[in-house]
C-alpha cells in the first residue's frame, strides 16, 4: 500500500512486502495501452522443454504461499526476479556481454531513476548510506528493466560446450500503442 504510513522509508530500507499479481496478457497489455506506456516484447531463444520449465517456475512463484515477498528495489524486484528464474531454467548458461565503459555507483544509478524527487533521493541516501558509493556490477545494474532488456538483447546462450552460442533473444518487437479517448 503506497499510502501506508512510512511507505517510502520502508521501501528505501527494503522492508516492504509486495504481492505478486497475475493478469492475462490481453488485460496486461490493455492496462499499459491505457496508460500510454510502451511495451517491448522479447521472445527468448528457449526450447519447448525450457519454456515449459519456466512456465512451471512462474506458476510456483505465483502460488498463494509464494505471492507475497520482501521486495528490495535493488536486488529482488520485477526485473531481477524473472531474470533469476530464466537463468535457473537455463542452468546459468546465459552469457551477458559486459559493457566496455565503467559502471555507475548505486547512488548514481538510483539518482537517475529518482529524477526530480529530492526527498526520495534523500531517503534512499539516509537508509542505504555509504554502501551506495561502490560501483555496481553489470548484474546488479540489471535491477532496472531497461538495463535488463539491453542485457538480454546482447546476451548469448550456449547449451553445451560443443554447441555454438546463439542469441538469447530470438526476436524483439514493440507492441503497438492504442490511444484511448
Listing of model-derived features with the role each one plays in the protein:
Residues 1-179:
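Soluble extramembrane regions of membrane proteins in the secretory/endomembrane system
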Amino acid at each position: 500500500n503506497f499510502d501506508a504510513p512510512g511507505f517510502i522509508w520502508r521501501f528505501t530500507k527494503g522492508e516492504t512486502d509486495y504481492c505478486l499479481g497475475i493478469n492475462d496478457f490481453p488485460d496486461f497489455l490493455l492496462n499499459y495501452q491505457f496508460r500510454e506506456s510502451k511495451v517491448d516484447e522479447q521472445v527468448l531463444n528457449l526450447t519447448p522443454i525450457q519454456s515449459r520449465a519456466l512456465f512451471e517456475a512462474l506458476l510456483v512463484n505465483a502460488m498463494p504461499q509464494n505471492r507475497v515477498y520482501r521486495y528490495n528495489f535493488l536486488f529482488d524486484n520485477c526485473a531481477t526476479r524473472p531474470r533469476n528464474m530464466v537463468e535457473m531454467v537455463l542452468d546459468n548458461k546465459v552469457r551477458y556481454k559486459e559493457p566496455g565503459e565503467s559502471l555507475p555507483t548505486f547512488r548514481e544509478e538510483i539518482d537517475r531513476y529518482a529524477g526530480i524527487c529530492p526527498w526520495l533521493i534523500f531517503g534512499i541516501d539516509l537508509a542505504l548510506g555509504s554502501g551506495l558509493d561502490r560501483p555496481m556490477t553489470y548484474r546488479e545494474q540489471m535491477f532496472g528493466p531497461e538495463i535488463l532488456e539491453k542485457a538480454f538483447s546482447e546476451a548469448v546462450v550456449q547449451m553445451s560446450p560443443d554447441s555454438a552460442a546463439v542469441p538469447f533473444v530470438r526476436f524483439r518487437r514493440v507492441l503497438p500503442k492504442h490511444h484511448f479517448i
